[in-house]
Amino acid sequence: MGVTKKPDLNDPVLRAKLAKGMGHNYYGEPAWPNDLLYIFPVVILGTIACNVGLAVLEPSMIGEPADPFATPLEILPEWYFFPVFQILRTVPNKLLGVLLMVSVPTGLLTVPFLENVNKFQNPFRRPVATTVFLFGTALSLWLGIGATLPIDKSLTLGLF
């Protein structure tokens, strides 16, 4: 790793550049009018054109019509609701299930306050936040996979 030299603030050339505005906020060209009038509309219109083009060239099929008299044997929610569905399915008391679901965001909101004295960004130097993240990820995967299985195999994932 090289040694970086600190700037000499007594240098008249550097002082003249800083006085002219060439400091930490000098980026080359202003955002007005170049970016806001010319580049942003091109990006926005390009995004709209891509969406319209995909909608015209590859229209999404609606699917089979719904039959209200033929329901599936087991109704499953969308994949992102699997952990919550598994909690409600396995906990016998509905109030306890709702409290467990409320405790998830509450617990996530308390994590920054547990490690607010730690100024590091490296996950290996923040053991509490890293442990909470890994435990929450493993628990969500376990509950999500278990929600796709029958109720008698859902807690053990059919392994035991």
UniProtKB/Swiss-Prot annotation:
Keywords: Chloroplast, Electron transport, Membrane, Photosynthesis, Plastid, Thylakoid, Transmembrane, Transmembrane helix, Transport. It is found in: Plastid, Chloroplast thylakoid membrane. Signal peptide: none annotated. Pfam families: Cytochrom_B_C. One of its GO terms (cellular component) is chloroplast thylakoid membrane. SUPFAM superfamilies: a domain/subunit of cytochrome bc1 complex (Ubiquinol-cytochrome c reductase) (SSF81648). Component of the cytochrome b6-f complex, which mediates electron transfer between photosystem II (PSII) and photosystem I (PSI), cyclic electron flow around PSI, and state transitions. The 4 large subunits of the cytochrome b6-f complex are cytochrome b6, subunit IV (17 kDa polypeptide, petD), cytochrome f and the Rieske protein, while the 4 small subunits are petG, petL, petM and petN. The complex functions as a dimer. This is Cytochrome b6-f complex subunit 4. It comes from Amborella trichopoda. The gene is petD.
